[in-house]
Amino acid sequence: MVEPNTRLEEPIVATQSAASLVNLRDLGGMPTTDGTTTAHGVLYRSDAPYPRDETPSTVPVWPPAAVLDLRAQVERDDVGHEWDQGSKLYHWPLYDRAAPISRDAPNLVDLYRNILEAVPHRVAAVVDVAATAEAPLLVHCAAGKDRTGITVAALLLAADVQPDAVMDDYLATAANMTALRNRWEAKGRNITVAEAWLLTPQDAIEFVLDEFLSWRGGPIGWLTDHGARPAAIDAWRSQIRPS
């Protein structure tokens, strides 16, 4: 099980102020395949927080009870944020090569393929956090788009959220990317990254969805085949899908 406060081995624009998170949203209200919707106040996604950020007003509860930080250690060292004692931090570096720090333009389909092929067990392991963490759980990386997008897609599909809704949620990030670049500049990040790091191509998320949906047993089969516990998946589903 992923333990908190340790570094582990192994639709909808939130806010456009550089003083706060710009790619934050609550993933409640998303339609499921059986006609229900996901619960509010359970799962958030966002870009990386910065010290002295303003409190966001677009989510029902803040700070989150739990935080799943998917960034590499070098990213955390560069941009550190100390959460209140009431927020449990799970540091789970997903895939260091997905850090948006390169001037070389990435092919995001290839990047997402590499993540799912190279570290599928690390994607599947996030179910343990989601199943046991107190809500709301915030999942974030640097931009809240690539590593976060894959992780959130896995969690939502495991809860039977409609694939089109998962895709639309990923694409909604596009509206926040200019604000994200402005935020990075306002926070004094002296990096120049290729514009492709801030794109949200539909074919990239379609590739991810197809990988999960076409797997034997669907998204749940993909997760269990890569190490997720069925009991954890059931517990997660009971949290995100109100009875």
Predicted feature locations:
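Ser/Thr-glycine-rich phosphate-binding loops at phosphate-binding pockets of nucleotides
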Residues: 143, 147-148
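Cys-dependent protein tyrosine phosphatase-like superfamily
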Residues: 1-138, 151-243
